């Protein structure tokens, strides 16, 4: 028997074909969300307060200090927040200290700072009753970047940019004349020496002393001449910079000094953040820049006087490590004191070394390092600027290397915590201005923190972020996998990121640093390809937001692969050689072969085993969770694997899902971490269990109660239904499944079913990827899903009196009211069809709505005969189903309702959708198709033992698409079915063809795994043997019920009087310009005329035509279309007198606006509602598909 048994949870054993020993378990798959938010609560929020506070008034007599903050209990529980359309948030109280510096008086007070949304255990937020996710953002890291560019003459120039987290950019560049320039904040360029002089190093010799003598420096000095002899060089430089930054304003050296200080050296205006400081120190550090260079001077220890390194020595890694302590200390440190006119007058400490030029052995080049400023220094220092200039000048000498902006060492992740902190900082900064003004205006003695703090800017900033940011998305809740993928998504879009239109091919492309960090396969098709990615299965963020991936360390001394795990970022990995996870190892952990496959900086090649530093921990570390669920991924073309990974996320939860016979072993962890299942929090014993509640007695005697969710509407309209897995008496351990969620079976993800599939054509019905299906799958509810739709009706106060929910609906027969209760609300369990009343509601009619007789009666009998209008909530088109639940909210019950609303009724209708022709289905290999025919079981082809086939697919769908994995899955699935086992074949480490054929033989199948099939209609065998097996097939969210649409009479647009478009508005089909040409080409003038008039916007014509049809009269001639009238009116609005004449030159009267209005015309308020609904649906669709 090939393979070995592996236990997944307590309910499933699979035969696994993996050969590689897993030394590291998968991390918690949603930790990117939960850990980041926890960091924000623990330290991020405190840092934001400390950044902005203390705040002083303009005269510096009062100061507001931050003391601390505390979160209190949330107002609503999770479930209550969902029901009441509220946010799951906790009130935050901040303690401030107000100090009066004149009297020394201190007032300490706790101030309510608004409700702050709290993350649920599942990594989501409940905002206004809807579950949302904050997508992590992939952005360019702050730091210093160097680049090269070739001009039109083929000359290489260099550039450099310092990018802060917030603040002005500082750029350097060379031109064709070999002069180096600098730009401050994207303004006009000035010679770089001008900035050096402004920093207080004004002499030409001083500049050459710092940077060394080079052609670039000399050319720039010649360009930068002293024009105004009355000014010092520094003052002149300062004025020149000021002129560039503030053109047109009077320039003085003092104003320039304060401007430059604010731009670069003031931590409140310029912030590199911890990551920017780390990146700058790493790039400008002397150790990395000396590596592999030949030193041109003796390196002497300043304390002992001994020669550490002699001139002419190559600075290899070992040499640098031997003097690392001195390099980090005072070795070759020089102190430069700026002149008195400088922007910053403190002494500048630099580390300077002379090395031999790699291009010209007779030349000596100076390398200047920034002497590693402390990590807490968040603003730039003059040393940083001089060291950046030195690196930039060294590039022209062949030293140093340019940066690749798409390298994941230069791109970092802003996760939830950081995005929230940034938003909170924006709110606090707005509040700061407000506080400062109030402190200055009001009397100091009576001021308290509560009086001067206005929290509105802060709460508005947070609300705006959760409500309308591009990164705050409605959770994709089709199934557990789509939830999990959404939480692990990385988007390069959003504020501060890229835009779709500007992003080129390079930024979207797969980069070698994606290995183990970002999935190269799972990304959307379409305009977002490559901009929206997914974290790889083992990916993890470090404290700076760079993605790390784990490796097993190799002990190079004895050449053994250890079980010690090292997490590396992309730029750390560049220094090492990494072997693949499937490298053959001896039992003692040494490499079995002298030469192993490995990679170094993106080169995949063979390396001697002695050179390998690390080994991959797992073959699946390269791919994301959804991709890791595709068996035989290694046999699929990557384009189809992309579709397979994406389509699994669109699977609809079925009534009775089944886990795949052929899985990858990832199904258990994906279901466990998705947040859709109920997981035990502690060890214990089950003391009560039913469909809605499970009670577990802990070992310490306390009781845990787990609530099971039954048929709740998910964000995507599917049924979110959990099923209890444990029974009374069961012992559960922490982390065990208590209940399956939607699309789960026995603690594993189960997106679809395991039908018997044959690759064969059948009467041409599976042309173009279509799927032919057996009626058994319909009758036995194999692919049946439950969908829930929510409808609501509210009563408001109108000018004519309040609306009322009642059973007394005017002009409606008793038949239509049979399922309404005494209040006029539908009963739970009622079966409803399109047009049925769900909530009976009447609205008072206005005077203008009454006829003359009614007005007379009203005048005689007073208020009693006041008429009401029927505004009941009815089942919309396509909303048939069974009433699952009714929720009533009233002020009397203490529910919070919008102003003007007296009562709100929500009705939930459940639909049971069986699979039907037009529904979309797919396998896991990108093999998708639409159901084209459902064939009676007796007509389906059958196996020699009489078993009918369930699905027939077209064999032509395989070769050109190169997704052979589906065929391997088919054969292995049949073997698993025959053996009664489940199989795990992990990606890149699964069943080989030998394993496959051995399992096929074990299952007693034929040696080619094909079989003779018999035609169900004739009983005759088909001519050739057919591949028949079990393939995992899923039903996708694209169902024909949601798409099929037809209209006879419906709403019209108000201005053009043409039918609206789209299913949501019950619109018509657009007959566009090109379709009109087609009818013109055929000369079908009558058809064309009625399409352009009656069927479109000839208001009077369509009324008369309708009347003629109903009365059986001939249809009259059409009139003038409304759109023509709109054109005439638009021309008249331009002052052109335009009239329409008939053939006898008589003027044609055009319809007035208020003429001919009919019930079919959609009024403005209806149109607004329709538009809102359409916008909401469009947004939901966009969020669930476009950003997937």
Swiss-Prot record:
Database matches in InterPro entries: DNA-dir_RNA_pol_bsu_ext_1_sf (IPR042107), DNA-dir_RNA_pol_bsu_external_1 (IPR019462), DNA-dir_RNA_pol_su2 (IPR015712), DNA-dir_RNAP_su2_dom (IPR007120), DNA-dir_RNAP_su2_hyb_sf (IPR037033), RNA_pol_bsu_bac (IPR010243), RNA_pol_bsu_CS (IPR007121), RNA_pol_bsu_protrusion (IPR007644)
Keyword 4Fe-4S: no
Swiss-Prot/TrEMBL keywords: DNA-directed RNA polymerase, Nucleotidyltransferase, Transcription, Transferase
Catalytic activity: RNA(n) + a ribonucleoside 5'-triphosphate = RNA(n+1) + diphosphate
Top-rank taxon, per record: Bacteria
GO MF annotations, alphabetized: DNA binding; DNA-directed RNA polymerase activity; ribonucleoside binding
Gene3D superfamilies xrefs: 2.40.50.100, 2.40.50.150, 3.90.1100.10, DNA-directed RNA polymerase, beta subunit, external 1 domain, DNA-directed RNA polymerase, subunit 2, domain 6, RNA polymerase alpha subunit dimerisation domain, RNA polymerase Rpb2, domain 2
CDD domains assigned to the protein according to its UniProt record, in alphabetical order: RNA_pol_B_RPB2
BP GO terms, sorted: DNA-templated transcription
Gene Ontology CC, one term: DNA-directed RNA polymerase complex
Keyword presence, Kinase: no
Subunit structure of this chain's protein: The RNAP catalytic core consists of 2 alpha, 1 beta, 1 beta' and 1 omega subunit. When a sigma factor is associated with the core the holoenzyme is formed, which can initiate transcription.
HAMAP family documented for this protein: RNApol_bact_RpoB
NCBIfam families documented for this protein: PRK00405.1 (NF001616), rpoB (TIGR02013)
Function: DNA-dependent RNA polymerase catalyzes the transcription of DNA into RNA using the four ribonucleoside triphosphates as substrates.
Sequence similarity: Belongs to the RNA polymerase beta chain family.
Protein name, as recorded: DNA-directed RNA polymerase subunit beta
Taxonomic lineage of the native organism: Bacteria, Bacillati, Bacillota, Bacilli, Lactobacillales
Gene this protein is translated from: rpoB
């Amino acid at each position: 028997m090939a393979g070995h048994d592996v236990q997944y949870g307590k309910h499933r054993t699979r035969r696994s074909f993996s050969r590689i020993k897993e030394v590291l378990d998968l991390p918690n798959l949603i930790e990117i969300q939960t850990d980041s938010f926890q960091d924000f609560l623990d330290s991020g929020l405190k840092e934001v307060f400390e950044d902005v506070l203390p705040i002083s008034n303009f005269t510096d007599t009062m100061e507001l200090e931050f003391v601390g903050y505390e979160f209190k209990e949330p107002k609503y529980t999770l479930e209550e927040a969902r029901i009441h359309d509220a946010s799951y948030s906790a009130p935050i109280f901040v303690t401030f200290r107000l100090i009066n510096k004149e009297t020394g008086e201190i007032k300490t007070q706790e101030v309510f700072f608004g409700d702050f949304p709290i993350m649920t255990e599942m990594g989501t937020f409940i905002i206004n009753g809807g579950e949302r996710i904050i997508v992590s953002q992939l952005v360019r890291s702050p730091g210093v970047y160097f680049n090269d560019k070739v001009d039109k003459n083929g000359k290489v120039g260099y550039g450099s940019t310092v990018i802060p987290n917030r603040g002005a950019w500082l750029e350097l560049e060379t031109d064709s004349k070999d002069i180096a320039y600098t730009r401050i904040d994207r303004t006009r360029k000035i010679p770089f020496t001008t900035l050096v002089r402004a920093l207080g190093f004004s002499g030409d010799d001083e500049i050459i002393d710092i940077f060394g003598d080079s052609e670039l420096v000399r050319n720039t000095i010649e360009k930068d001449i002293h024009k105004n002899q009355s000014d010092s060089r520094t003052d002149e430089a300062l004025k020149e910079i000021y002129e560039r930054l503030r053109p047109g304003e009077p320039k003085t050296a003092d104003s320039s000094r304060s401007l430059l200080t604010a731009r670069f050296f003031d931590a409140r205006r310029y912030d590199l953040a911890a990551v920017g400081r780390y990146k700058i120190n790493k790039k400008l550090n002397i150790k990395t820049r000396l590596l592999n260079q030949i030193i041109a001077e003796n390196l002497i220890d300043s304390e002992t006087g001994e020669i550490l390194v002699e001139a002419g020595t190559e600075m290899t890694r070992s040499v640098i490590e031997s003097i690392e302590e001195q390099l980090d200390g005072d070795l070759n440190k020089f102190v430069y004191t700026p002149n008195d006119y400088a922007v910053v007058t403190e002494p500048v400490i630099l580390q300077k070394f002379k090395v031999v030029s790699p291009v010209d052995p007779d030349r000596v080049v100076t390398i200047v390092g920034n002497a590693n400023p402390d990590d807490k220094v968040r603003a730039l220092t003059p040393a940083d600027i001089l060291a950046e200039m030195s690196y930039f000048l060294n590039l022209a000498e062949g030293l140093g290397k340019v940066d690749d902006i798409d390298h994941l060492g230069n791109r970092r992740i802003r996760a939830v915590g950081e995005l929230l902190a940034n938003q909170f900082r924006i709110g606090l900064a707005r509040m700061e201005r407000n506080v400062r003004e109030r402190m200055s205006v009001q009397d100091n003695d009576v001021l308290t923190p509560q009086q001067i703090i206005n929290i509105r800017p802060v709460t508005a900033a947070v609300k705006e972020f959760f409500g309308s940011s591009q990164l705050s998305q409605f959770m994709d809740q089709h199934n557990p996998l789509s939830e999990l993928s959404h939480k692990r998504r990385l988007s390069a879009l959003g504020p501060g990121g890229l835009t779709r239109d500007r992003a080129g091919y390079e930024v979207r492309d797969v980069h070698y640093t994606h290995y183990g960090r970002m999935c190269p396969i799972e990304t959307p098709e379409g305009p977002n390809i490559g901009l929206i990615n997914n974290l790889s299965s083992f990916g993890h963020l470090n404290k700076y937001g760079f993605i790390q991936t784990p490796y097993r360390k190799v002990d190079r001394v004895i050449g053994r692969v250890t079980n010690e795990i090292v997490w590396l970022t992309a730029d750390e990995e560049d220094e090492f050689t990494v072997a693949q996870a499937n490298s053959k190892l001896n039992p003692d952990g040494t490499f079995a072969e002298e030469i192993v496959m490995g990679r170094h900086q993106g080169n995949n090649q063979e390396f001697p085993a002695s050179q390998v530093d690390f080994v991959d921990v797992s073959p699946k570390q390269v791919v994301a969770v959804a991709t890791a669920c595709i068996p035989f991924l290694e046999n699929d073309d990557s384009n189809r694997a992309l579709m397979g990974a994406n389509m699994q996320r669109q699977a609809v939860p079925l009534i009775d899902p089944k886990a795949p016979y052929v899985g990858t072993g990832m199904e258990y962890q994906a279901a466990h971490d998705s947040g859709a299942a109920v997981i035990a929090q502690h060890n214990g014993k089950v003391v009560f269990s039913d469909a809605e509640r499970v009670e577990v007695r802990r070992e310490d005697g306390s009781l845990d109660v787990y609530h099971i969710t039954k048929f709740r509407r998910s964000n995507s309209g599917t049924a979110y239904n959990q099923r209890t897995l444990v029974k009374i008496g069961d012992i559960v351990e922490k982390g065990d499944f208590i209940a399956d969620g939607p699309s789960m079976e026995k603690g594993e993800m189960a997106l679809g079913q395991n039908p018997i599939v044959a690759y064969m054509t059948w009467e041409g019905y599976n042309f173009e990827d279509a799927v032919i299906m057996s009626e058994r799958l319909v009758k036995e509810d194999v692919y049946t899903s439950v969908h829930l739709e929510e409808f609501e009706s509210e009563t408001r106060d109108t000018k004519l009196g309040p609306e009322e929910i009642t059973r007394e609906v005017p002009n409606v027969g008793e038949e239509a009211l049979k399922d309404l209760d005494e209040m006029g609300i539908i009963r739970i369990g009622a079966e409803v069809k399109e047009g049925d009343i769900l909530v009976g509601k009447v609205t008072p009619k206005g005077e203008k709505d009454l006829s003359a007789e009614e007005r007379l009666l009203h005048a005689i009998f007073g208020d009693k005969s006041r008429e009401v209008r029927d505004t009941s909530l009815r089942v919309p088109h396509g909303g048939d189903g069974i009433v699952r639940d009714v929720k009533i909210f009233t002020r009397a019950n203490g529910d919070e309702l919008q102003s003007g609303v007296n009562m709100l009724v929500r009705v939930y209708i459940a639909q049971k959708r069986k699979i039907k022709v037009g529904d979309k289905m797919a396998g896991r290999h990108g093999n998708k198709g639409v159901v084209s025919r459902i064939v009676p079981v007796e007509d389906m082809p059958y196996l020699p033992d009489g078993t009918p086939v369930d699905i027939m697919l077209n064999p032509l769908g395989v070769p050109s698409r190169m997704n052979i994995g589906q065929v391997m899955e088919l054969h292995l699935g049949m073997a698993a079915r025959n053996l009664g086992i489940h199989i795990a074949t992990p990606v890149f480490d699964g069943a080989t063809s030998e394993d496959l054929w051995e399992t096929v033989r074990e299952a007693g199948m034929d040696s080619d795994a094909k079989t003779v099939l018999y035609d169900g209609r004739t009983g005759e065998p088909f001519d050739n043997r057919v591949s028949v097996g079990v393939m995992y097939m899923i039903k996708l969210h694209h169902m024909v019920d949601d798409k099929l649409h037809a209209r006879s009479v419906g709403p019209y647009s108000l201005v053009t009087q043409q039918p609206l478009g789209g299913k949501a508005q019950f619109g018509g089909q657009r007959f566009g310009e090109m379709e009109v040409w087609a009818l013109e080409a055929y000369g079908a003038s009558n058809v064309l005329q009625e399409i352009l008039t009656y069927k479109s916007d000839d208001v009077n014509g369509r009324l008369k035509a309708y009347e003629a049809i109903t009365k059986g009269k001939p249809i009259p001639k059409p009139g003038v279309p409304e759109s023509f009238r709109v054109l005439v009116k638009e021309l008249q609005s331009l002052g052109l007198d335009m009239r329409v004449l008939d053939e006898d030159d008589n003027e044609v009267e055009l319809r007035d606006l208020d003429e001919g209005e009919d019930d079919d015309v959609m009024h403005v308020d209806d149109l607004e509602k329709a538009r809102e609904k359409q916008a909401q649906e469009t947004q939901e669709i966009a969020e669930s598909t476009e950003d997937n």
